[in-house]
């Protein structure tokens, strides 16, 4: 029987429930990063060596291998999750199996595999029905019309968490500060950064800071901001003559060829006119009038902001490089302790989903924390900041101990260690009270340990906000009514 959500405002009050406590208490710098995949695992990093995954399906924690992070675990440590795990070229295949050179560590059924090239089945994204565990893992999918071969290239749509540890003094450490945990492989790896693996974007990582990914896959499917069929293509262009896009609104998104000529290819969009996308790298196979495409969040980019500075950095996963961005308008002032940063990608208002002037997927919203009751917004497409957005009532200052969650039209914020929750509406630019947790917290500490989980049954979605309390092992959750 389908689930029906009968909760109504006023009639049904929000109530905070106790969940399974975390095995290690929250400390300064501890944070939670959500996978945003269908199992909705949450990575809790409580030190340079101790990390746990929370499984909301079972309300339970499990320790994972040590990340052995260099640096000093402290305020400023942060993390994010991308939607793409390991990739490679098959060593053999049939119409329903792909033999990989990967050493998969766990059952991945329910996750998906995207075929990026190699001939047959290019562009398809298939649920994983089963897989072997161990060396040269074999992945089984639904039977296809053509066989996979040793030329088939693929990427697994499985969680990968990127973690950046704090650096308390310039020059004290470089390597292994920036690492990622691959869920499919159950391994930690220093992120590629050129001459020295695992280096940080800035000389000092501290005060408070955030890593922000912009994944194409959210939950159990791609998050497409636009889709269509090309009318033509060039060496590094894709044309859809029926469109009326605003100039450069798609810059720094990605375009993926879903089917037709060139299927499986993914490129970063460098610019656009009303009808033409220009990519940052040439196509291997030029699209044509048969090419069906999606425009999505960019799987290659991770943004870093914080450390009591206005400087904004961007990491390229494929290139293994940090870039210091030079926004047209710089952020007016540095964020402090209690800052936030959220990529807004699922606002429901028509103005945000309008393909001709897209807003979803375009902005990173950031409260400045102790730097004041101020909210700034970074425009990913135009590489510019809008500082001190007007919103009402802009009175609450979020300091040490503040925690944040983004979901749909709302950014939820718990102030300091007070238990008082607020919500900001990205569509209407309003903030109001949302809830209060009456359970007493410990000392307020920097580090974001709130997250969201949603229950979905057909057309019904029920959202929950979770929070690990300050200096505590207590985990609470409340249903969004």
Describe the function of each predicted region.
Residues 1-85, 103-107, 148-224, 246, ...:
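Kelch-like beta-propeller repeat domains
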């Amino acid at each position: 029987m389908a689930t029906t959500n009968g909760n109504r405002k006023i009639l049904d009050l929000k109530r905070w429930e106790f969940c399974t406590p975390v095995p290690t208490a929250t400390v300064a710098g501890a944070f939670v990063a959500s996978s945003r995949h269908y199992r909705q695992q949450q990575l809790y990093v409580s030190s340079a060596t101790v990390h746990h995954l929370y499984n909301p399906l079972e309300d339970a924690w499990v320790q994972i291998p040590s990340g052995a992070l260099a640096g000093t675990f402290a305020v400023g440590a942060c993390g994010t999750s991308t939607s793409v795990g390991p990739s490679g070229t098959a060593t053999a295949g049939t119409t329903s199996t792909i033999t990989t050179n990967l050493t998969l560590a766990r059952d991945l059924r329910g996750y998906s595999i995207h075929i990026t090239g190699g001939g047959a089945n290019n562009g398809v994204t298939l649920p994983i029905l089963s897989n072997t565990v161990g060396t040269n893992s074999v992945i089984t999918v639904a039977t296809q019309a053509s066989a996979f071969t040793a030329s088939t290239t693929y990427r697994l749509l499985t969680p990968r968490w990127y973690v950046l540890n704090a650096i308390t003094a310039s020059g004290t450490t470089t390597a292994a500060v920036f690492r990622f945990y691959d869920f499919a492989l159950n391994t930690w790896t220093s992120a590629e950064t050129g001459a020295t693996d695992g280096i940080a974007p800035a000389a000092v990582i501290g005060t408070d800071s955030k890593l922000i990914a912009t994944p194409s896959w959210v939950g159990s499917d791609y998050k497409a901001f636009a889709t269509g069929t090309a009318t033509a293509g060039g060496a590094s262009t894709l044309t859809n003559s029926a469109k009326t896009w605003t100039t450069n609104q798609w810059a720094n998104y990605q375009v993926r060829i879903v089917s037709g000529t060139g299927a499986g290819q993914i490129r970063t969009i460098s610019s656009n006119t009303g009808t033409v996308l220009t990519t940052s790298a040439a196509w291997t196979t030029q699209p044509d009038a048969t090419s069906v495409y999606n425009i999505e969040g960019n799987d290659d980019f991770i943004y870093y902001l914080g450390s009591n500075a206005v400087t904004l950095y961007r990491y390229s996963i494929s290139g293994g490089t940090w870039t210091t961005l030079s926004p047209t308008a710089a952020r007016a002032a540095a964020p402090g302790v209690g800052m936030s940063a959220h990529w807004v990608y699922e606002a429901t208002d028509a103005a945000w989903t309008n393909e001709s002037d897209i807003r979803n997927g375009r902005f990173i919203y950031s409260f400045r924390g102790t730097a004041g009751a101020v909210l700034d917004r970074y425009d990913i497409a135009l590489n510019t900041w809008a500082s001190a957005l007007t919103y009402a009532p802009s009175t609450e200052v979020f300091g040490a101990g503040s925690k944040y969650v983004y979901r749909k039209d709302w950014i939820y914020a718990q102030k300091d260690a007070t238990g008082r929750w607020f919500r900001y509406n990205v569509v209407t630019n309003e903030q109001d009270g949302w809830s209060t947790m009456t359970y007493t917290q410990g000392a307020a500490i920097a580090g974001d340990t709130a997250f969201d989980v949603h229950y979905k049954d057909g057309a019904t979605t029920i959202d929950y906000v979770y929070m690990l309390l300050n200096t505590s092992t207590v985990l609470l959750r409340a249903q969004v009514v």
